[in-house]
């Protein structure tokens, strides 16, 4: 078996990532348990690589993922676009309106400070990655 790669100048993208993109909720300097508000970001292991290469090195990036066709899913989609990643390969999945069939995964991340390490809590129940 052999793999033939096209030259870079004949490719539309430098990197295409495949995986779940979640809504990341950041309580800034606070703990998740005591936070009264959160900053929102998009994130996912594979996606973060493409976004980083796009933002830092100007690489052409796209993501293959699925998002729920509701306000939270569209927020994540807008954040993907603002992050410089092409969103044309997003599959939009209908929502039941209450999250009983499918919903956008959530990730809460506390920043680490000094000796306090970062803490992450994911809520991925019924997210697209599990269906």
Task: State what each model feature region is.
Residues 60-129:
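Conserved N-terminal subdomain of the carbohydrate kinase-like
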Residues 20, 44-46, 67:
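Gly/Ser/Thr-rich helix-start
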Residues 4-5, 49-50, 94, 107:
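Short secondary-structure capping/turn segments at boundaries of alpha-helices and beta-strands
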Residues 41, 48-60, 82:
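Alpha-helix C-terminal capping segments
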Residues 1-33:
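Positively charged, low-complexity intrinsically disordered leader regions
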Residues 34-43:
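Short pre-catalytic strand/loop immediately N-terminal to key active-site residues, enriched for Gly-Thr
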Residues 46-47, 73:
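Generic non-transmembrane alpha-helix signal with a bias for helix starts/N-cap capping motifs
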């Amino acid at each position: 078996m052999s793999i033939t790669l096209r030259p870079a100048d004949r490719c539309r993208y430098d990197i295409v990532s495949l995986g779940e993109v979640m809504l990341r909720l950041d309580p800034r300097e606070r703990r998740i348990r005591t936070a009264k508000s959160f900053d929102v970001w998009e994130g996912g292991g594979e996606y973060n690589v493409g976004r980083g290469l796009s933002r830092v090195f100007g690489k052409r990036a796209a993501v293959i993922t699925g998002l729920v066709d509701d306000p939270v899913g569209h927020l994540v989609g807008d954040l993907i676009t603002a992050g410089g990643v092409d969103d044309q390969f997003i599959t939009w999945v209908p929502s039941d309106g209450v999250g009983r069939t499918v919903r956008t995964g959530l990730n809460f991340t506390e920043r680490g400070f000094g000796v306090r390490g970062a803490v992450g809590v994911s809520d991925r129940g019924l997210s697209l990655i599990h269906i």
